[in-house]
Amino acid sequence: MQTPKPIKRALLSVSDKTGILDFATALHNAGVELLSTGGTAKLLAEAGLPVKEVSDHTGHPEIMAGRVKTLHPKIHGGILARRGVDEAVMEENNIAPIDLVVVNLYPFAATVANEDCTLEDAIENIDIGGPTMVRAAAKNHKDVTIVVNAADYSRVLAEMNDNNGSLTYSTRFDLAIKAFEHTAEYDGMIANYFGARLDSTGCEADCDHQHSEFPRTYNIQLTKKQDLRYGENSHQEAAFYVENNIQEASVATATQLQGKELSFNNIADTDAALECVKEFEEPACVIVKHANPCGVAIGNDILTAYDRAFKTDPTSAFGGIIAFNRELDAKTAHAIVDRQFVEVIIAPAVSDEAKEVVSAKKNVRLLACGDWAGQLTEGYDFKRVNGGLLVQERDFGMVEMEDLEVVTKRKPSEEELRDLMFCWKVAKYVKSNAIVYCKDGMTVGVGAGQMSRVYSAKIAGIKAADENLEVAGSVMASDAFFPFRDGIDAAAHAGIKAVIQPGGSMRDQEVIDAADEHGIAMVFTGMRHFRH
């Protein structure tokens, strides 16, 4: 069993000074000698703490405008020295051991996220001494503790208090892992930034070149949120990893209020439902089954929206995922638990009364994800293929009503335009080939994932007929263009009065002529929404 190691000397050098003064004060009160640099040393000294500048400790001043501060044998020897092995070398070179290193790095990510950031700005925010100390301390975690996150300050102090000023090996090892993760993420961000600037080679300062969105090598770091019982199928091992520092309301950041542990498929389906419901400003409900919306509706309140969404396809809604864009209230919660079996309910917030209602069904997973008003976080989608990874920008595209191009003789009415926009938002989240029928802010039929677009149209009609929903007078959305007129003919047979689609087929005119023959109004968006 490893013996806890006492903390007698600490080196503190942080860019993010959150909590550092209180932490340093507690260390001082525990009898720890404080070494520090630059702004951190200034902050501690101004607070009256007895802090020793690194330059005084090494006998060598900071040079090159602070570029060289801690890169000195007395610092790295003190960190890397193996206790019980290197004492003679330390004594010969007048090196004192450093037991605790507290470092976080220059804010490179925040710097390059600024649209006014120049190449020189980025270069000056590449930390050199910090990562070197972090890696040295993490390497020598047998004897040295490394802290890179202010969230761990209280943990360190609590353990020191319980162990007479010492820290256990398990804590040092865990913090060392965090340190290596921290430097890996940091170096990955730098590599991504410079890898996307390959055409700027030779620029002396900054340049006006158009840089690639995608670097030569792509580095990402995710943190495991939980192990899962299994993957998409029971014979597959799985875990859920989340992006670091994500701020957007999402399934990754949601708080589970009750219910069984989320499964792999629960998480995937909940993401599909939540991202779809985010598209709507009015109170809305989205019900998802196997990653496809099977019912979507808006209403004056979420209870009305849920009632209407459920009516689209009550059969498929069984065991589905339900997402709302308003707080879940008790009336809506009652309607759900009294009516159907549901796997997951997710909403921005959940009232106390709604929590009590849902608690009667203890297995239902209830999630609160927070508000997303105005959020559109930049980012990428990833799709693994054997031996590689497809990377693309997230699909934030959505046309406005005024951008629609009317291509038929008959123009859609104002009511039809509203339904067309609603239907287009739903189609964006239906697996291709996607055909969606909608009427009065409610889906009446969804045809998803067919190899032939006309069969998706037929299935949407069949689904509506199965639930005794009236298609006549509805509108239709297609996630991509119609390659032939047969999809329009099928829509006309079902009673569709208006169509929204991207356009762009070689046979667009044939499709337009078909719509005119049937008296159907049709608009082009100029934007496709394939979803695979």
UniProtKB/Swiss-Prot annotation:
Coiled coil: none annotated. Its EC number is 2.1.2.3, 3.5.4.10. The keyword Hydrolase applies. The keyword Oxidoreductase does not apply. GO terms for biological process: 'de novo' IMP biosynthetic process. One of its GO terms (molecular function) is IMP cyclohydrolase activity. It comes from the Bacteria. Keywords: Hydrolase, Multifunctional enzyme, Purine biosynthesis, Transferase. SMART domains: AICARFT_IMPCHas, MGS. InterPro entries: AICAR_Tfase_dup_dom_sf, Cytidine_deaminase-like, MGS-like_dom, MGS-like_dom_sf, PurH-like. One of its GO terms (cellular component) is cytosol. Residues 1-148 form the MGS-like domain. It catalyses: (6R)-10-formyltetrahydrofolate + 5-amino-1-(5-phospho-beta-D-ribosyl)imidazole-4-carboxamide = 5-formamido-1-(5-phospho-D-ribosyl)imidazole-4-carboxamide + (6S)-5,6,7,8-tetrahydrofolate; IMP + H2O = 5-formamido-1-(5-phospho-D-ribosyl)imidazole-4-carboxamide. The IMP cyclohydrolase activity resides in the N-terminal region. Belongs to the PurH family. This is Bifunctional purine biosynthesis protein PurH. It comes from Alteromonas mediterranea (strain DSM 17117 / CIP 110805 / LMG 28347 / Deep ecotype).
